[in-house]
Amino acid sequence: MISIAFKHYGFYSPSSNEILETIQMVRMEHLDIRTVTMGISLRDCSHPDPEVFNENIYEKITSRAKELIRTTNEIQSLYGIPIINRRISVTPISIAAESCRSQDFVSVAKTMDEAAKEAGVDFIGGFSALVHKGETRGDLKLINSIPEALASTEKVCSSVNVATTKAGINMDAVGLMGKVIKKTAELTAERDGIGCAKLVVFANAPEDNPFMAGAFHGIGEPECVINVGVSGPGAVNTAVCELENPNLTEISETIKKTAFKITRMGEMVGKEVSRRLGVEFGILDLSLAPTPAIGDSVAAILEAMGLERCGTHGTTAALALLNDAVKKGGAMASSSVGGLSGAFIPVSEDAGMIEAVKAGSLTLEKLEAMTSVCSVGLDMIAVPGDTSAATLSAIIADEMAVGVINKKTTAVRIIPAPGKAVGDSVEFGGLLGSAPIMPVSSFSSETFVNRGGRIPAPIQSLTN
């Protein structure tokens, strides 16, 4: 069936060995489609009456996504390729709900939650604001409502873009987001601050990202679109481990070939979902997204290259090799590569990262260095519950600077776990996994953060 599908979409005809390798990846090496995400524009739903607006977005989401679950289940059964999550992303709510009152934004989040449940999807993203150069009244109303919105919903995810290479870093927004994260943790304290696992702060956020918590349907996107995220750390790790005393060039070539196969499979699934739903196919996100399962780990790939433990000296170089090889292999396989496309390093979602933190080899500072060469940023990191809002903002500012200067996407998804200290851990379950509490600096950044203003765009932003 995989061979037939490849021919159907005009791909090269794979050999019998390649087909068997793909089947092996699915059955034994945790290869799957991590997410099929439907992006839906809500721009035509805007209305000053909150009741009408909520009715509009509920109707739009549920009508557009009504066949998503059935269709993906059929394709999963047809091809034998697991599809782990079905998700929805929508137009940033701060734009669609600009005319709503402050007290209306939580009701919008609840409506999104109800629509996601009706559609049967796992998450819905887009409770978002883009404030890299300043905030509108709608942006501020949304940002201030995030803690209550995430505490009172199950499936809603939120993101805020506070920096771009072209605009610089909005430090007023960075300072505000530290407080929002603290408040979100407090309102979900009984669940180890899980609300913060559904909130991400971005620099250079992509408009077509299929992964949560950062997915939103950008204003340059079509009416409705299908974006797909693949997953394959286990397959890449197995391929590297099977090499006999390779040099790093040989490791890179092997990763490229594996990424090529993973990408072909993902594009095949995405295009078939789009065809059956009558919706435009958008992008394929190449990101290697780990899970807490043993063997499905980005850290394990780095250790297979020769590192005793992820986080030791050489880790950043190994991650750069991995990220580059994944992109090269994926770009050869598809003309629809987009989103984040690289390697994720979420601590709580990667068994190898968790062990590295526990062993003391992986620190917050080393993770920050690693984010300069990989797909996203400081992801799913748990810190002590008494971490100040200013310290959280300073961590965000550092990560935004990495993204702005290097002209890449970076992000922070951090959990100040209420009542927890270094040595403790938090348990979220499922794909979110668990995380040991990591220490932060005991020195204050408060005066710096409170200065506010905007860190200007770097000289490399002048590209015209």
Swiss-Prot record:
Pfam families named in the record: DUF711
InterPro entries: UPF0210
HAMAP family (UniProt xref): UPF0210
PANTHER family, alphabetized: UPF0210 PROTEIN MJ1665, UPF0210 PROTEIN SPR0218
Family statement: Belongs to the UPF0210 family.
Listed name of the protein: UPF0210 protein MA_1691
